[in-house]
């Protein structure tokens, strides 16, 4: 399945949640697109579970096959499956770049990582799905620091709260991973138990 690259606002309206964060177009019309968008549709249990899974996929920009692999990995962990799934998604490098305020959206963060702007523990990494670990150090590469995206990030630092499990240091925009997040530290409008129920059928 190809990655969705269409209008994000339309997808947000279809799933009933702001997938970007601060999407003014969605806030103006938070109902599904199309002629009958305002019509009430009776939610079946399956539809609710599917919709929650799709919300998670599009929030983090993950394709179906990869999302299923994340779920299967979460099942093998000792904690609650839904919470473990969210921890895996949060530990992706593109999400960490977004959470640290170095990109306005996860889609932009994915592009920055893909274009080779970051190193992890001194090693160049250009894979958005790369999984960070506790005590990792993520740096913007020297030749990228003065490019427009990172200049904007420095100017807008503080506009969005940074989660307590990571820290951004000074003008170099270095990201320190103090720990991997607990569920209470993950602010996403998702009911992960519905995703577990979807895959448990």
UniProtKB/Swiss-Prot annotation:
It comes from the Bacteria. Residues 1-42 are annotated as: Disordered. Residues 91-157 form the S4 RNA-binding domain. One of its GO terms (cellular component) is small ribosomal subunit. InterPro entries: Ribosomal_uS4 (IPR022801), Ribosomal_uS4_bac-type (IPR005709), Ribosomal_uS4_CS (IPR018079), Ribosomal_uS4_N (IPR001912), S4_RNA-bd (IPR002942), S4_RNA-bd_sf (IPR036986). The keyword tRNA processing does not apply. One of its GO terms (molecular function) is rRNA binding. The keyword rRNA-binding applies. GO terms for biological process: ribosomal small subunit biogenesis; translation. Coiled coil: none annotated. Keywords: Ribonucleoprotein, Ribosomal protein, RNA-binding, rRNA-binding. One of the primary rRNA binding proteins, it binds directly to 16S rRNA where it nucleates assembly of the body of the 30S subunit. Belongs to the universal ribosomal protein uS4 family. Part of the 30S ribosomal subunit. Contacts protein S5. The interaction surface between S4 and S5 is involved in control of translational fidelity. This is Small ribosomal subunit protein uS4. The lineage of its organism: Bacteria, Bacillati, Actinomycetota, Actinomycetes, Mycobacteriales. The gene is rpsD.
């Amino acid at each position: 399945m190809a990655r969705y690259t269409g209008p994000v606002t339309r997808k947000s309206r279809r799933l009933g949640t702001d997938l970007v964060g601060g999407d003014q177009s969605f806030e103006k019309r938070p109902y599904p697109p199309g002629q009958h968008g305002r019509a009430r549709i009776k939610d079946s249990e399956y539809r609710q579970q599917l919709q929650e899974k799709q919300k998670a996929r599009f929030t983090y920009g993950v394709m179906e096959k990869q999302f299923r692999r994340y779920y299967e990995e979460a099942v093998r962990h000792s904690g609650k499956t839904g919470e473990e799934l969210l921890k895996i998604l949060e530990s992706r490098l593109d999400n960490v770049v977004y959470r640290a305020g170095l990109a306005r959206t996860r889609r932009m963060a994915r592009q920055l990582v893909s274009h080779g702007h970051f190193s992890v523990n001194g090693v160049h990494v250009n894979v958005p799905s790369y999984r960070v670990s506790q005590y990792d150090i993520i740096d913007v590469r020297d030749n990228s620091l003065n490019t427009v995206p990172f200049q904007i990030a420095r100017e807008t630092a503080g506009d969005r709260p940074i989660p307590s499990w990571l820290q951004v240091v000074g003008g170099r925009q270095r990201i320190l991973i103090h720990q991997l997040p607990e569920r209470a530290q993950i602010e996403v409008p998702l009911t992960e138990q519905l995703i577990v129920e979807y895959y448990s059928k």
